[in-house]
């Protein structure tokens, strides 16, 4: 059991994170799983945490260390957001999960992946935990809130995510025209659209229509939960004209605190 989160377990009347015991251990207990060989651990990797959990699960299965993995992405950003900070407007709560298991099929599975962490030039401070924007609150309270340097995050994402996506897709040996959907972390609609435009520009091909499902307008930015919840919406039904068929080649891509990127 892999639980990816940043602020996944916070009571409704506090913004203090409860990490002892781990959230994954709590999930295992609630599911009443008796087998001690079912290992449970948390990942804190910023918004890319759930995708990183999927990558790790794939490695466990491929190596023979596991046959089935539950990967959960969950966050409660509403409880660590500063209501006086305009960056807090799109923060949301959410959770999503998948189960990966081994099989002998050659027509399904994870074809390739790519992960990176940038810290050398101060990228680790682009998103951080800080005091409220309101002086009266910050002066009289020790509470911290999620904060970010929005412009730096935006520029970092546009400069680095398209190349990371290309590295991942090139490793799959697939043709770019066969890519059916891109599920990208729902951080900012304008930023996501710009990332995808730059990604296709790297291949010198026009961006296909209907390649990029988006749900940030309805669900907001729920951090690690955005990709699994969006994937679920599209997989279950014809969501805003987006649907999936067996055998479709899709891509997950995310960027977030760290700064971390994966695809």
Locations of the language-model features?
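Solvent-exposed alpha-helices and their adjacent loops that cap or buttress functional pockets
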Residues: 33-35, 61-64, 88-92, 103, ...
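Short beta-strand segments
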Residues: 3-4, 44, 69-75, 100, ...
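Short glycine-rich phosphate-binding loop at a beta-alpha junction
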Residues: 1-4, 175-185
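Condensing-enzyme catalytic core mediating Claisen C-C bond formation in acyl metabolism
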Residues: 84-159, 163, 255, 263
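Acidic-glycine-rich active-site phosphate/pyrophosphate-binding loop
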Residues: 18-34, 71-76, 135-137, 192-208
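Glycine-rich beta-alpha junction loops
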Residues: 7, 75-76, 103-104, 114-121, ...
